[in-house]
């Protein structure tokens, strides 16, 4: 790890925080940043988790203060997510790097579809939301499954959670977003613990990236661009395409 690594990672992680604050999907930029810098995939995932924990902690606290997290619904989902992410992280560390890259290659088109699709989600008013036993079960199941994915890889986790909580658990977008923040914090913490235990986190780089990520998030939230999501979508798709090409070149090389 040298100065060039920091020069590649930090600006992109800053952009990731900025993008995430405006329209979500920052992880689609932050993890590729580590991979572009030539960091091994498992270490890249672990270090990305380290910097992501800071951003998700701030976001979760902010949503909680605004009353956007239903604690009774979030708690079982958070517990399920914690277990799922731990499983996913351990699976990631046991997988050969080549297999992990192949899995990423298969996941990327689906993530790109979610980023591009504008009509997948349906908003619901608070009156339309009916939190029943089914809601608790589907929310916990979603959290567990996405938790495994987040521990295994990560980018797009927030998007997956919002989609599942909206479509499967039938929560409104505002409520789904709030629950997703709490669940995502749990998945990040759980998987980070596993990666730290196995020594696959570059602490100096992670700290620098965390500062850049939080600064980007602060500026992005402050600007609050009305057309932010529309402007960000092409950037996310470009990053996905570049990462797709990067992984193919690694597999062929």
Regions found by a protein language model. Name each.
Residues 1-40, 126-177:
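Selected transmembrane alpha-helices and immediately adjacent juxtamembrane segments
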Residues 22, 65, 94-95, 117-118, ...:
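Helix-loop junctions at the membrane-solvent interface of multi-pass transporters
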Residues 36, 43, 89, 93, ...:
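Transmembrane helix-loop junction
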Residues 42-46, 177-181:
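Small-residue hotspots at the loop-to-helix junctions and early N-terminal turns
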Residues 58-68, 89, 105-131, 244-253:
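Transmembrane helix exit motif
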């Amino acid at each position: 790890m040298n100065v060039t690594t920091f020069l590649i990672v930090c600006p992109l992680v800053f952009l990731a925080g900025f993008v995430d604050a405006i329209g979500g999907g920052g992880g689609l930029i932050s993890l590729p940043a580590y991979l572009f810098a030539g960091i091994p995939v498992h270490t890249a995932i672990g270090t990305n988790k380290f910097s992501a924990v800071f951003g998700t902690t701030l976001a979760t606290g902010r949503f909680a203060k605004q009353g956007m997290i239903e604690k009774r619904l979030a708690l079982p989902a958070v517990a399920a997510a914690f277990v799922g992410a731990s499983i996913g992280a351990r699976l990631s560390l046991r997988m050969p790097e080549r297999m992990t890259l192949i899995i990423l290659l298969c996941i990327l088109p689906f993530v790109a579809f979610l980023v591009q699709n504008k009509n997948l989600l349906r908003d619901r008013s608070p009156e339309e939301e009916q939190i029943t036993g089914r809601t608790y079960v589907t929310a916990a199941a979603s959290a567990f499954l996405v938790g495994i994915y987040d521990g295994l890889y990560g980018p797009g986790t927030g998007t997956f959670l919002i989609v599942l909580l909206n479509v499967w658990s039938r929560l409104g977008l505002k409520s789904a977003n709030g629950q997703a923040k709490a669940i995502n914090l749990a998945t990040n913490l759980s998987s980070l613990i596993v990666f730290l235990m196995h020594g696959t986190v570059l602490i100096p780089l992670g700290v620098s990236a965390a500062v850049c990520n939080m600064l980007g998030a602060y500026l992005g939230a402050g600007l609050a661009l009305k057309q932010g999501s529309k402007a960000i979508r092409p950037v996310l798709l470009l990053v996905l395409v570049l990462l797709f090409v990067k992984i193919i070149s690694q597999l062929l090389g």
